């Protein structure tokens, strides 16, 4: 269970880093807003799912 928790936590950190860099870039380029909007929604959904997963796994690991 600890390995799954660590993998989820590392995934959350990596997705957070990608979103911190990617969101301003997506907003700064108006040409590809339609494509970027889909990726932003997908990234946000993955981030929320990972936050909930890490919270749930933290309950079982600790």
UniProtKB/Swiss-Prot annotation:
Family the UniProt entry places it in: Belongs to the PsbZ family.
Domain of life (superkingdom): Bacteria
Keyword Cytoplasm appears in the UniProt entry: no
Lineage: Bacteria, Bacillati, Cyanobacteriota, Cyanophyceae, Nostocales
Keyword vocabulary terms for this entry: Membrane, Photosynthesis, Photosystem II, Reaction center, Thylakoid, Transmembrane, Transmembrane helix
Subunit composition and interactions: PSII is composed of 1 copy each of membrane proteins PsbA, PsbB, PsbC, PsbD, PsbE, PsbF, PsbH, PsbI, PsbJ, PsbK, PsbL, PsbM, PsbT, PsbX, PsbY, PsbZ, Psb30/Ycf12, peripheral proteins PsbO, CyanoQ (PsbQ), PsbU, PsbV and a large number of cofactors. It forms dimeric complexes.
Annotated function: May control the interaction of photosystem II (PSII) cores with the light-harvesting antenna, regulates electron flow through the 2 photosystem reaction centers. PSII is a light-driven water plastoquinone oxidoreductase, using light energy to abstract electrons from H(2)O, generating a proton gradient subsequently used for ATP formation.
Pfam families: Ycf9
Membrane topology, from the record: Multi-pass membrane protein
GO terms, biological process: photosynthesis; photosystem II stabilization
Location of the protein in the cell: Cellular thylakoid membrane
Cross-referenced NCBIfam families: PS_II_psbZ
Principal subcellular localisation of the protein: membrane
Transmembrane segments: 8-28, 41-61
Gene Ontology cellular component annotations, sorted alphabetically: photosystem II reaction center; plasma membrane-derived thylakoid membrane
Species: Trichormus variabilis (strain ATCC 29413 / PCC 7937) (Anabaena variabilis)
Thylakoid found in the keyword field: yes
Protein name: Photosystem II reaction center protein Z
Recorded name of the encoding gene: psbZ
InterPro entries in alphabetical order: PSII_PsbZ (IPR002644), PSII_PsbZ_sf (IPR036512)
């Amino acid at each position: 269970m600890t390995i799954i928790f660590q993998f989820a936590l590392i995934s959350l950190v990596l997705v957070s880093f990608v979103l911190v860099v990617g969101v301003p870039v997506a907003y700064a380029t108006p040409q590809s807003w339609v494509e970027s909007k889909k990726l932003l929604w997908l990234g946000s959904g993955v981030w929320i799912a990972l936050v909930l997963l890490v919270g749930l796994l933290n309950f079982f690991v600790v």
